[in-house]
Design a protein with these regions (language model features):
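Histidine-centered active-site/metal-ligand motif
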Residues: 35-37, 267, 309
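Active-site-proximal binding-pocket segments
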Residues: 271, 275-282, 286-333
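Metal-cofactor-binding active-site regions of metalloenzymes
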Residues: 2-260, 303, 319-424
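Acidic, glycine-rich loop-and-beta core segments that form the ion-binding/anion-interacting portion
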Residues: 234-294
């Protein structure tokens, strides 16, 4: 695309030029993906990539059982390759891959010039097996139009924690995040794990337990240098309440975030394991009581909260709370919401209520190559949405320039996050 000169950037755009100007910005400087489940190369086999991982992603596993007679217990007894073959046959050969998740696989194959038809997976497997991870990451990020991602790092994961303790090499393209799900949602299961690591804690948070949890968080903050702490929470989450989780949040997590100068990310609305037979694919969604968020934002005005809610029915309420509390930053269209029709609706509502003071999207990618189609979908879906916003503004009498669009796009897809977490 041609370079825009400074003179052109300040000229008012005609309505017919606005969409092209937005698309130009969307394909300009790379964006920052502020929540993923990807891993830097030094964390080794934790990082998932390649065609078999793409096809056996739990979104597609959930779809498999709607289009196949294969039972979950039969499926989970198969090898990785056999699982991928079963999903390919059911969702890509015997059915047109029209869902968001299946189209994503097609988009990745197309991006690498691989066959997208109903043939087998041999050529794709051969291609991915030949890749070297460092150069492959560079190519994937280039295709996705991103420069860096934010990881999800669990200090109590028995596979991940030792890698950090052994000095996993940092990578400027991968920002760490201290994930707290095990501590906050499965405290009784983790007490003995923490005790074995030398922390004096008990199930009821007696004695030095709170101080010891803060010591644990401080050690991992120093080790990881995370850009925020994060937790996913159920649709039943309440605050305040008489529970171990509420005490840990109020007395350990919130003060630690404040001490370290980083936000807490709250992802609210999961209904865990509604169908345990599906394993990772077995979680559902529920409408949450966001008065818990209200009380946290009001009770801890010196803390910052990144917030994403899983239920579509909670989105308007989250926007209202963000208008009332500047320490709340709504982000992304998470999980079941990451479908183009819902992304468009949510983004339009957020712009109407919050201007440009939110983060429209993150990929939530669990497999490396997913960032290609997830960010492609985001650009394709949101360019018309943002362009229409500017057309309405121009129609109301305010000229819109390329400079305006450049500023806003950079704010939405990089600047708001960098400012909120202190990277800028």
């Amino acid at each position: 695309m041609p370079t825009v000169t400074p003179d052109q950037s300040t000229v008012a755009l005609a309505p017919g030029e606005i969409l092209q100007a937005v698309e130009h910005e969307f394909h300009g400087a790379p964006w920052l993906d502020m929540h993923t489940h990807l891993f830097m190369p030094s964390l080794g086999k934790l990082g998932l990539w390649g065609i078999d991982e793409l096809i056996t992603y739990h979104y597609l596993e959930a779809e498999l059982f709607r289009s196949s007679n294969l039972r979950p217990d039969q499926y989970f007894g198969l090898s990785k390759r056999a699982k991928a073959d079963a999903i390919w046959k059911a969702l890509f050969v015997e059915n047109a891959p029209v869902s968001e998740a299946t189209r994503g696989v097609i988009a990745v194959l197309q991006a690498f010039g691989l066959p997208t038809g109903t043939g087998g997976l041999a050529e794709a497997r051969k291609f991915f097996e030949a890749q070297k991870i460092a150069s492959h990451i560079h190519k994937v990020f280039e295709l996705a139009g991103i420069s860096e991602v934010v990881m999800t790092n669990d200090p109590l994961d028995p596979e991940e924690a030792p890698l950090w303790e052994d000095g996993a090499a940092p990578d400027k393209k991968f920002h760490p995040v201290l994930r707290l799900d095990r501590i906050l949602n499965k405290w009784t299961d983790q007490v003995d794990v923490l005790a074995a690591k030398g922390f004096s804690v008990d199930r009821n948070l007696g004695g030095k337990s709170i101080a010891e949890v803060r010591r644990f968080l401080a050690e991992w903050f120093a080790r990881m240098k995370p850009v925020y702490m994060a937790v996913s929470l159920p649709d039943t989450f309440q605050y305040p309440e008489e529970s171990v989780r509420a005490r840990l949040i109020a007395e350990a997590v919130i003060p630690s975030c404040r001490e370290f100068g980083i936000p807490a990310s709250l992802m609210i609305g999961v209904r865990y394991q509604v169908n345990p037979a599906l394993k990772l694919a077995g979680d559902g969604v529920g409408k949450a009581d966001l008065r818990a968020l209200e009380r946290l934002a009001a009770g801890f005005p010196d803390n910052r909260f990144l917030v994403s809610v899983l239920s579509r029915e909670n989105q308007h309420e989250l926007c209202v709370y963000a208008r009332k509390f500047a320490n709340i930053l709504p982000f992304g269209c998470w999980w079941f919401l990451n479908n183009p029709s819902v992304v468009e609706e949510m983004t339009r509502e957020r712009i109407e209520m919050l201007g440009m003071s939110f983060i429209p999207q993150h990929s939530d990618a669990r497999v490396l190559e997913q960032v290609i189609y997830k960010w492609r979908n985001t650009r394709r879906t949101l360019a018309p949405t943002l362009a229409n916003t500017y057309k309405l503004l121009a129609g109301d009498g305010r000229p819109v320039t390329r400079e305006d669009i450049h500023r806003d796009v950079q704010r939405l897809f990089r600047g708001n996050f960098e400012r909120f977490v202190g990277l800028s």
